[in-house]
């Protein structure tokens, strides 16, 4: 399931960090969605974390099984709709888009990790029949 609406505003990989102005690795894919629009669990699993998380702002982390996890960052204050330990299904609303943490505007920072290592969400989702690219 596509985790949010909007176009890709910042892809996975190296980029100029808008806060430090240095070349740095961006471990997720940013979707420029409207403020307060819904964020959906892209895959089913169990919520591992739900709350503030530094530069990610308000953040939800879901264990999707088989070493895979998905992260959802910059959630609006008061917009986390799940709790740690809660099972979630694909497409379930879990949060609302915001601009908390190191963010320059409303968007979802969507991160996919395999065995703890960040992977590019665009080909991963495409292989699962979901298009993130514009």
Where are these regions (language model features)?
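Catalytic cores of peptidoglycan-degrading enzymes
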Residues: 2-134
